[in-house]
Amino acid sequence: MANTILTPITLWKDFDDTLPFNEEFLSKEEREGAVMRDVYILGRQTGFGRVKIYGRYYTPNGLESFPAVLIMFEAGFPCDEKLVMHFIRKGYGVLGIDYSGELGDGRHTIYPRDIDHANFARAGRAMDYVDETARETSWYEWTAVARYAARWLKERPEVTAAGAVGLRTGGEILWKIAPYAPIDCFISI
């Protein structure tokens, strides 16, 4: 099949990021002036189910409301606790999400089997090439995860404003969600 070039408008026009999150908090731990919670939220619907997005949500201890930051780390790398704690000390909440998917042991974003190419370790051609349309790439799925995560963070009742920080691959993803996501500002590093 010949490649089909899609503009950003046509690429995302049928995307539905309004489905309910059905969040599931898994654990709660207090440390260094923060409360850390592991959370799963549901993302986009595919033919084989919904993406189950894994994240860690940090909130500053003792604050009822605060601004928050979505952090998109480098693909395949774990959370940078030092960076997270920098924001916590400044009074921000932080949501660090996994978009890399299955990389080994531990909690991760779970992609339905029809979009297995979203798992960073198995992305293959879907990361570097567009064989049909951009919708069949890892980048599309990672961007979809970021759109859901940004909306979840912005809709939290305790969050007064939401920004985002992206590191390397995470920064590239932020450029892709900027026109669509409910974030007030972002920086790509």
Give each language-model segment a name:
Residues R147-I189:
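Primarily recognizes the serine-hydrolase "nucleophile elbow" in alpha/beta-hydrolase
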Residues M85-A144:
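Cap/lid segment of the alpha/beta-hydrolase catalytic domain
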Residues A68-I71, V94-I97, G163, C185-S188:
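Structural recognition of the beta-strand scaffold that forms the well-ordered cores
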